[in-house]
Amino acid sequence: MTLNLCVLTPNRMIWDSEVKEIILSTNSGQIGVLPNHAPIATAVDIGLLRIRLKDRWLTVALMGGFARISNNEITILGNGAEISTDIDPQEAQQTLEIAEANLSKAEGKRQAIEANLALRRARTRVEAIKVISS
């Protein structure tokens, strides 16, 4: 038995295919979803989406959003998402370094919050790449 997973962002469809299982980062922690999972609607946190295909795992860097699971259908509406193999490692590392520098230079609460979110997004992209190479 399989699940149908659809991952959408404001710009494009990232994924629309059958999968065996997913591991999703939510605001209350990670959840694993197998066929016949109980229906749920949840906020999606900035983090990794792990997708199990027949014999391998695929990783997606998710930038937050919303997920709905019902009747073996999973729909994720993401603020942004990138499949790990599409991420340029050098660019991701540079973005992480810039985000770290911006956080240390942040003045005021708003700048600190924005810099912290940018840092979380950058770390997620780098983490997605590391999953490929390990």
From Swiss-Prot:
Pfam families tied to this protein: ATP-synt_DE (PF00401), ATP-synt_DE_N (PF02823)
The protein's matches in HAMAP family, at most eight in alphabetical order, are given as: ATP_synth_epsil_bac
Q: Provide the topology term for how it sits in the membrane.
A: Peripheral membrane protein
Q: Does the keyword Transcription apply?
A: no
Q: Which SUPFAM superfamilies match?
A: Epsilon subunit of F1F0-ATP synthase N-terminal domain (SSF51344)
Q: Which NCBIfam families match?
A: ATP_synt_epsi (TIGR01216)
Keywords of the record, alphabetical order, are:
ATP synthesis, CF(1), Chloroplast, Hydrogen ion transport, Ion transport, Membrane, Plastid, Thylakoid, Transport
As for what it does, the entry says: Produces ATP from ADP in the presence of a proton gradient across the membrane.
Gene name, per UniProt, is atpE
Give one GO term, molecular function aspect. proton-transporting ATP synthase activity, rotational mechanism
Record GO cellular component, one term: proton-transporting ATP synthase complex
Subunit composition? F-type ATPases have 2 components, CF(1) - the catalytic core - and CF(0) - the membrane proton channel. CF(1) has five subunits: alpha(3), beta(3), gamma(1), delta(1), epsilon(1). CF(0) has three main subunits: a, b and c.
Among its keywords, does the record have Methyltransferase? Answer: no
- Just give the chief location class: plastid
Q: Which organism is it from?
A: Phalaenopsis aphrodite subsp. formosana (Moth orchid)
Q: What is this protein called?
A: ATP synthase epsilon chain, chloroplastic
Domain of life of the native organism:
Eukaryota
Tell me its family.
Answer: Belongs to the ATPase epsilon chain family.
Question: What subcellular locations does the record give?
Answer: Plastid, Chloroplast thylakoid membrane
